[in-house]
Amino acid sequence: MSAVKAARYGKDNVRVYKVHKDEKTGVQTVYEMTVCVLLEGEIETSYTKADNSVIVATDSIKNTIYITAKQNPVTPPELFGSILGTHFIEKYNHIHAAHVNIVCHRWTRMDIDGKPHPHSFIRDSEEKRNVQVDVVEGKGIDIKSSLSGLTVLKSTNSQFWGFLRDEYTTLKETWDRILSTDVDATWQWKNFSGLQEVRSHVPKFDATWATAREVTLKTFAEDNSASVQATMYKMAEQILARQQLIETVEYSLPNKHYFEIDLSWHKGLQNTGKNAEVFAPQSDPNGLIKCTVGRSSLKSKL
């Protein structure tokens, strides 16, 4: 005898663009995002008995995303995701959970002749702001915020030495190396009782995103890094200290390697050690370092 153990469905890759027009100043502000909504509830019969009566059509989910974006603010995305998820569990009695993922695409206002342009923008990087909102009936709202695709590099002030050495080790110790990574940072908010509580904390979502970004960049730049592990822990520690509603901070940092090129074969040209100026950036393989840091009162899952 078979039974459905878990099921969710919905609409993915819904692209949304919204413009806010200030009629007084003529300044326009744009937002672009990609949204995924997955629903859970009493939907087993759609799988086991071909009963479509319990299915909220994914096309209807798409339409709901557009209508909700028209009728509500789409920023901060934590609020928009909470409004959207709450709609589904309140509208449909048999739907008990809504999972909303939002990826915000970057549009930065252009500066023209030294002044911000009122309606022109540039995508100056592939950095993204993301949220995962889980609205569960009777259990409140869980929100994870994150930034990803923030590519950084520093040409010095990074070390790696004192690591375990055995018969598999060929890596040389170094007290000065290039450090580059694509930052993926996630912070888990405390559980919110419902949409009203989320609304009461709206200013903190943008402020915390800005704080996390600023802490990440400042620590990366200024820390004389003993390792990626040590630096990412310092980043997470500072974010937790600056926002008490955050329960955990998680970093995932690839270590993107830049190798010295030995050019001594060409007329004795010196390009290693202190003389290294030309390097070969490596696409793969790369290191990958992950860490979740929480408050000491929370149990570790190590």
Curated annotation (Swiss-Prot):
Active site: 11, 58, 257
Cystine connections: none
Function: Urate oxidase is a cofactorless enzyme involved in the metabolism of purines. Catalyzes, in the presence of molecular oxygen, the hydroxylation of uric acid to metastable 5-hydroxyisourate (5-HIU) which is further degraded to allantoin.
Biotechnology usage: Recombnant urate oxidase might be effective in reducing serum uric acid, and thus could be used to prevent and treat tumor lysis syndrome (TLS), a serious complication of malignancies that can result in renal failure or death in children with cancer.
Oligomeric form and interacting partners: Homotetramer.
Keyword annotations: Acetylation, Oxidoreductase, Peroxisome, Purine metabolism
Assigned EC number: 1.7.3.3
InterPro entries reported in the protein's UniProt record: Uricase (IPR002042), Uricase_CS (IPR019842)
Modified residues annotated as N-acetylserine in this record: 2
Binding site for O2: 58, 255
Motif range (Microbody targeting signal): 300-302
Binding site for urate: 58-59, 160, 177, 228-229, 255
Main location: other
GO molecular function: urate oxidase activity
Activity's thermal dependence: Optimum temperature is 30 degrees Celsius.
Identification of the protein by name: Uricase
Gene responsible for this protein: uaZ
Binding-site residues, 5-hydroxyisourate: 58-59, 160, 177, 228-229, 255
